[in-house]
């Protein structure tokens, strides 16, 4: 079985991939678009991508690619607590440049401003790439923001642990495939994810669409708009619903009512949610 994921090794996505797929073939790709396209082109059986961070919000590239260009289905979700660390070759060295992925830098913005106000921030494709860059340039006064996994991989010192600005920082990862898949991990619940496109000629369309879930007591954990890429002011709505034994019977009727209102519904996935240890 082949699994595509957002690499390189040492990234948070690779931590999830190696935890969930202990004995499968793992293939790292350079971008989210490449990961999803690898699945769509039949190069792998599953694709693993980040979908949302609790601090920085939705990973727009993932949801947009899935909605606009892919027929992939969400078959599982993994939630990984994110622990960012400052890594360098030595704890005693001077730090003039700090490298990392934009989201990692955003998650540690306050810490870096307070402790390294003169350091210049440099962007890399991933946290792991930042750690690798530091490893390969021992003569430069540089550091990386990355996880402890990357520190071990590239033999770097952890200058400071848990430097993220907000406690409880976590990232959701979606596993894309054809059929629902279960894992020997801590299961915390079930979800249904939808993409709704509202009709132009229905006054109060969004309110009416949401109401089909509200009056049935179906819990909605997320709603967010994204551009339809048609014209300004046109959106689709990404919605996550709590799925359980009670809601499992109600959701099909809610979807039927949405269709009756003229709302286009795409089922992105019906899947289990798993909680992983700290990354």
Swiss-Prot record:
GO terms for cellular component: cytoplasm. PANTHER family: PREPHENATE DEHYDRATASE P PROTEIN, PREPHENATE DEHYDRATASE-RELATED. GO terms for biological process: L-phenylalanine biosynthetic process. Residues 194-270 form the ACT domain. Pathway: Amino-acid biosynthesis; L-phenylalanine biosynthesis; phenylpyruvate from prephenate: step 1/1. Gene3D superfamilies: 3.30.70.260, Periplasmic binding protein-like II (3.40.190.10). The keyword Lyase applies. It holds the Pfam family PDT. Keywords: Amino-acid biosynthesis, Aromatic amino acid biosynthesis, Lyase, Phenylalanine biosynthesis. The record marks 171 as: Essential for activity. GO terms for molecular function: prephenate dehydratase activity. Residues 2-178 form the Prephenate dehydratase domain. It comes from Lactococcus lactis subsp. lactis (strain IL1403). It catalyses: prephenate + H(+) = 3-phenylpyruvate + CO2 + H2O. Its EC number is 4.2.1.51. This is Prephenate dehydratase.
């Amino acid at each position: 079985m082949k699994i595509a994921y957002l690499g390189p090794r040492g990234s948070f996505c690779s931590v999830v991939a190696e935890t969930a797929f202990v004995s499968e073939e793992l293939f790292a790709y350079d971008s989210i678009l490449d990961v999803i396209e690898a699945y769509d082109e039949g190069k792998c059986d599953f694709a693993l991508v980040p979908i949302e961070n609790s601090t920085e919000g939705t990973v727009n590239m993932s949801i947009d690619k899935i909605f606009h260009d892919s027929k992939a289905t969400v078959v599982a979700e993994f939630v990984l607590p994110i622990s960012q660390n400052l890594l360098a070759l030595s704890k005693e060295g001077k730090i003039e440049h700090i490298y990392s992925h934009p989201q990692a830098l955003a998650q540690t913005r306050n810490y870096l401003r307070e402790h390294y106000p003169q350091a210049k921030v440099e962007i890399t494709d991933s946290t792991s790439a930042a750690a690798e860059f530091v490893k390969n340039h021992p003569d430069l006064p540089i550091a990386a923001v990355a996880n402890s996994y990357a520190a071990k991989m590239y033999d770097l010192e952890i200058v400071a642990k848990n430097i993220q600005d907000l406690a409880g920082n976590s990232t959701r990862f979606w596993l894309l495939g054809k059929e629902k898949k279960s894992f020997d991990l801590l299961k915390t619940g079930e979800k249904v994810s939808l993409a709704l496109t509202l009709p132009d000629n229905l006054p109060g369309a969004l309110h009416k669409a949401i109401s089909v879930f509200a009056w049935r007591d179906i819990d909605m954990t997320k709603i967010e708009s994204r551009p339809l890429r048609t014209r300004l002011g046109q959106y689709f709505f990404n919605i996550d619903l709590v799925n359980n034994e009670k809601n499992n019977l109600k959701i099909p009727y809610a979807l039927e009512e949405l269709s009756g209102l003229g709302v286009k519904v795409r089922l992105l996935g019906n899947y289990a949610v798993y909680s992983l240890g700290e990354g």
